[in-house]
Amino acid sequence: MEIIKKLWGHEEIIINRQYCGKKLVLNKGFRCSMHYHKKKDETFYIVKGRVLMEVDGKKKIMLPGDSQHIAPGSKHRFTGLEDSEIIEFSTHHEEEDSYRIEESGKVNLKDIEA
């Protein structure tokens, strides 16, 4: 298994062949970049914590057991409202297919949850 450190936590890549499986560990008060993929089709499943998911301008708080499908071309990001774990199921991941609009970083949760 490959572990990739990120500003917001880390990714544990379980498999990345014709399909991809990852465990995402998201730290409280951090978010990934706002981005989209031209090819990648993904589904996120919340295992632990509370996550603010933003998809194409719509916001939703996700809890353990919730899932969210992200179609190719959909702009998305997630924010850790608590320390969280997310399982990602997707088509093959290629870093060249990630188009970032806003960078990842630390956020003030008071601004988000107000």
Predicted ranges, named:
Residues 1-34, 40:
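A short glycine-rich, His/Asp/Glu-containing loop-to-beta-strand
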Residues 3-4, 77, 81-114:
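Double-stranded beta-helix
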Residues 23, 43, 58-60:
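Short, surface-exposed secondary-structure edge patches
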Residues 33, 53-55, 88:
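Short hydrophobic/aromatic-rich beta-strand segments that constitute the beta-sheet cores
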Residues 39-51, 56:
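Glycine- and acidic-residue-biased ligand/ion/polar-headgroup-sensing regions
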Residues 56-75:
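Short acidic-glycine-tyrosine-enriched beta hairpin
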